[in-house]
């Protein structure tokens, strides 16, 4: 028998006067998954998370966390989630340990249990060395860790993270990403972001939102094969640009191509074939016939950025 999903969402809709923020969302998240909500600003990511965190009522549909309805059992749901909103509100005049003890008591933990859990999350989130410091004196990266520790302190079934690396420098981003991956070994995590590498490096599954609707849901690896059943070929060739364009435009097996300059006289040609076609022999033959200098010929794969652009463009075309 399969365990109950940690998140169950069915036909979830949120309307505001004059606009619909999310429309008919349905998805599940299983135990131990790190699932990314990916989409541009305004796609409905934060709205979805606020509904799951009981911060915002839906207009229609159902949502359950660990088997409990977020609308009729909101108190029980709040006990089972740890939520880090995008704004990460903290008491900046409190010390780290003091703040986490305060938050643990607010979440219903006993004095003894609070002490044990605060010690645990300080270690887990790399905060032990700054536990006596005032939060307002910490860097943005450490403040984000305090927010994560707060979300973890009551041992929730689900951790909800809304844009957890926004505003951080590259070093802080890497540090927080690694922390999230480590937490994913023990917790179910739902993370929202508009940063494509964030999902690729952190998440086991992706939900792509566009204009309040889910347009794709799969693993990053499967999504990278979703645009075409053919395998993209990357060729770096030194040749006149017009010759390359003419060759790919008149090659019947090439469904789509992009040409970008590389170093020197070389161009990077990204060639998407028709389904089931391997373009490499044809590219090699063309290079030989035209005396092009070919220095690289490999299978490529679509980036999440290409997938996102493709899916949202396709979605817009279907609604016209």
Question: How does the language model describe each region?
Answer:
Residues 3, 274-320:
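C-terminal coupling/interaction segments
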Residues 4-9, 14-211, 215-216:
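ABC transporter nucleotide-binding domains
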Residues 82, 108, 126, 147, ...:
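A generic structural signal for secondary-structure junctions
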Residues 119, 137, 263-264, 302:
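Positions that flank functional sites
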Residues 177-274:
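ABC transporter nucleotide-binding domain
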């Amino acid at each position: 028998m399969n365990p109950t999903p940690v998140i169950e969402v069915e036909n979830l809709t949120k309307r505001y006067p004059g606009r619909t923020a999310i429309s008919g969302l349905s998805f599940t998240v299983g135990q131990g998954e790190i699932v990314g909500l990916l989409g541009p600003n305004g796609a409905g990511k934060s709205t979805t998370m606020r509904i799951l965190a009981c911060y915002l009522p839906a207009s229609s549909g159902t949502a359950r966390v660990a088997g409990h309805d977020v609308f009729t059992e909101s108190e029980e749901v709040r006990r089972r989630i740890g939520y880090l909103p995008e704004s990460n509100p903290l008491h900046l005049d409190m010390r780290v340990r003091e703040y986490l003890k305060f938050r643990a008591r607010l979440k219903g933990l006993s004095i003894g249990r609070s002490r044990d859990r605060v010690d645990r999350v300080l270690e887990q989130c790399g905060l032990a060395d700054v536990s006596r410091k005032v939060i307002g004196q910490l860097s943005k990266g450490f403040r984000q860790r305090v927010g994560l520790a707060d979300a973890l302190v009551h041992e929730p079934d689900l951790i909800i993270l809304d844009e957890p690396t926004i505003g951080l420098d590259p070093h802080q981003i890497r540090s927080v990403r690694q922390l999230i991956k480590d937490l994913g070994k023990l917790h179910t995590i739902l993370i929202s972001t508009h940063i494509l590498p964030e999902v690729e490096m952190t998440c086991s599954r992706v939900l792509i939102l566009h204009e309040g609707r889910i347009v794709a849901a799969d693993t990053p690896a499967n999504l990278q094969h979703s645009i075409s059943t053919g395998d993209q070929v990357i060729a770096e060739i030194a040749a006149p640009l017009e010759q390359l364009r003419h060759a790919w435009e008149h090659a019947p097996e090439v469904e789509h191509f992009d040409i970008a300059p590389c170093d020197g006289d070389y161009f990077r040609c990204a060639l998407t074939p028709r389904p089931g076609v391997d373009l490499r022999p044809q590219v090699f033959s063309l290079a030989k016939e035209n005396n092009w200098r070919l220095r690289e010929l490999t299978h490529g794969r679509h980036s999440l950025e290409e997938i996102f652009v493709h899916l949202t463009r396709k979605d817009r075309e279907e609604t016209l």
